């Protein structure tokens, strides 16, 4: 709630104006029945046409003024609520963008999407209702009750009884509905999760012909959400007929008992009519308040869910007193006694990691699945922070660098090429918005992407669909590599980034890349020995520990794990042939 209130402070002036116009609406509504009473008592009964005309004209003017005030209230309420929702949505997005991978793991992607859209929409809708009704209804209820008692105090018990019945009904519905609202948002999360999994994994689903299984999973989530929605909506729908019954019985009771008072000379017809109007205003006010009370718990769930994200402080932030890299920074990476354990995990993924990656050299990492290769290189851009030890960049602990300065030193290429909606050029410029057209073309040429880009209808201005769905996997990887090159970093990180390339393209790319990065630090994660065997240094990982460092030839002599990997992948003849063919490539 504190986040909502902080944003609300920006709209205090509009809120004060809204309060003023709301007061105008209420005063107009409370004034009209009294004038109607005067028309009946002093005009119609006494046959005084001037009283009818004068009071009638005043009623028309007041009605017009009240209508104008109501329009302004609606406009201001929408302006405040939508403005708050916009700022809250931006604040939430900025917080999510600042999360480390460890922070992301606290929430599912589907849940974050729901909180950023559905929950904020719920808050916006409720805010409009609160601003329009929560102020007006109590004032109208109190004012209407006072006016009613002034006109016919002997009938006030009817209003008290009607309000009591409404209170019991609303309290009962409130008690039943509130727990369901939280469940409802959880079910929306679940449905979004199933939908997202199906959209992302559509190819796999079709490949294994599991459409019916996935449809069943979606239908189960859909039916569960539908049942809960139906239950809540049916519960809310009970309020309307109950309200109608209360209003009708109240009207009949007022007319019945009012007629007896009129016949006994204790009440005038105009006063009874005014009392009836005020009674309806009081009852309607309670109906409006009940709508607010029903909406607020659901919005409160959304506020809590959004607050959970906003209250999650990023675990990786800029240091309070950041250090600067030396002016002659070259990109030297050094791991000193690094240990890393994932949050909530019992055992470390990496233990006692020590190595130096020198500028001008290619350092490769290899190991069995789960050995910690990708985790290790994910520590360098600070996707995670080390649990113990240090990672130094040109002698400076990366935790003492501003995140912007650190990222400016790194060209990162993930295993799966990730592209964004936009053009080919905008994707290559993604890491360096100031990159010139010449640099973009150079990066594409080095990444072996120039040929297929030139074949596109609009070349570098060709549109890339969301996720790069209109280009092949190999083309996505080449554009990802070009994006890293365009940053012109001192450190290149390739997380098995050549897996989607054919052998010929791979060889060409590596040959050109070797020239471009001859004075840079290059880190490569490989799954196959033939992709990393010509690196200047190969680091072998096994169960989170370094079990070997050296060249291919040295490791073939001294490292048993490396020998096992080589034996499982290639024959001796293949190793010799690849070694000869690949010389000078890296």
Task: Go through the PLM ranges and name each one.
Residues 46-47, 82, 90-114, 118-120, ...:
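Short intracellular "coupling" helices and adjacent cytoplasmic loop segments at the cytosolic face
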Residues 33-37, 74, 89-93, 110, ...:
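Alpha-helical transmembrane segments of polytopic integral membrane proteins
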Residues 48, 52, 143, 147-164, ...:
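Helix-loop-helix
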Residues 10, 14-27, 129-184, 256-267:
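Transmembrane helices of ABC transporter permease
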Residues 1-32, 36, 44-60, 65, ...:
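Membrane-integrated ABC transporters
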């Amino acid at each position: 709630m504190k986040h909502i209130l902080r944003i609300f402070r920006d709209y205090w002036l509009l809120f004060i104006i809204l309060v003023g116009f709301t007061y105008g609406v209420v005063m107009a509504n409370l004034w009209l029945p009294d004038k109607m009473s005067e028309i009946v008592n002093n005009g119609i009964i006494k046959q005084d046409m001037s009283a009818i005309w004068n009071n009638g004209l005043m009623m028309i003017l007041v009605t017009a003024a009240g209508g104008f005030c109501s329009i302004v209230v609606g406009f201001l309420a929408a302006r405040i609520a939508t403005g708050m929702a916009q700022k809250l949505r931006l604040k939430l997005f900025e917080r999510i963008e600042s999360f480390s991978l460890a922070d992301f793991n606290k929430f599912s992607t589907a849940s974050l999407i729901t909180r950023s859209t559905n929950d904020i929409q719920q808050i916006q809708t409720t805010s409009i209702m609160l601003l329009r009704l929560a102020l007006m209804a109590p004032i109208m209820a109190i004012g209407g009750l006072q006016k009613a008692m002034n006109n016919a105090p002997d009938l006030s018990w009817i209003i008290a009884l009607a309000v009591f019945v409404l209170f019991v009904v609303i309290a009962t519905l409130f008690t039943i509905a509130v727990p369901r609202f939280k469940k409802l948002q959880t079910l929306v999360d679940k449905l979004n999760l199933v939908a997202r999994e199906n959209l992302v994994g559509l190819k796999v689903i079709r490949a294994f012909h599991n459409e019916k299984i996935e449809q069943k999973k979606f239908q189960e989530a859909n039916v569960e959400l539908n049942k809960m929605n139906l239950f809540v909506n049916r519960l809310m729908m009970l309020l309307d007929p109950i309200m109608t019954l209360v209003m009708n019985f109240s009207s009949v009771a007022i007319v019945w008992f009012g007629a007896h008072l009129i016949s006994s000379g204790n009440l005038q017809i105009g006063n009874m009519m005014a009392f009836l109007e005020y009674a309806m205003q009081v009852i309607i006010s309670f109906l409006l308040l009940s709508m607010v009370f029903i909406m607020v718990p659901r919005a409160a769930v959304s506020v809590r869910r959004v607050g959970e994200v906003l209250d999650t402080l990023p675990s990786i932030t800029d240091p309070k007193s950041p250090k600067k890299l030396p002016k002659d920074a070259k990109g030297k990476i050094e791991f000193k006694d690094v240990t890393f354990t994932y949050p909530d995990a019992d055992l470390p993924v990496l233990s006692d990691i020590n190595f130096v990656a020198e500028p001008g050299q290619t350092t490769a990492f290899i190991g069995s699945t789960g050995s910690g290769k990708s985790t290790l290189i994910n520590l360098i851009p600070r996707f995670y922070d080390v649990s113990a030890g240090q990672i130094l960049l040109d002698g400076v602990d990366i935790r003492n660098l501003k995140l912007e300065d650190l990222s400016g030193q790194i060209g990162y290429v993930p295993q799966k090429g990730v592209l964004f909606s936009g053009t080919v050029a905008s994707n290559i410029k993604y890491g360096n918005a100031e990159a010139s057209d010449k640099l973009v073309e150079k990066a594409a040429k080095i990444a072996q992407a120039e040929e297929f880009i030139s074949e596109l209808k609009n070349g570098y201005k060709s549109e890339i669909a969301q996720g790069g769905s209109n280009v092949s996997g190999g083309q996505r990887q080449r554009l990802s590599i070009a994006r890293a090159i365009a940053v012109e970093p001192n450190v290149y990180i390739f997380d098995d980034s050549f897996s989607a390339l054919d052998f010929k393209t791979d060889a060409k790319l590596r040959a050109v890349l070797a020239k471009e990065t001859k004075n840079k630090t290059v880190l490569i994660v490989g799954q196959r020995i033939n992709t990393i065997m010509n690196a200047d240094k190969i680091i072998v990982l096994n169960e989170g520990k370094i079990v070997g460092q050296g060249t291919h030839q040295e490791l073939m002599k001294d490292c048993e794990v490396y020998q096992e990997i080589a034996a499982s992948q290639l024959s001796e003849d293949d190793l010799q042939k690849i070694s000869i063919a690949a010389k000078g490539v890296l």
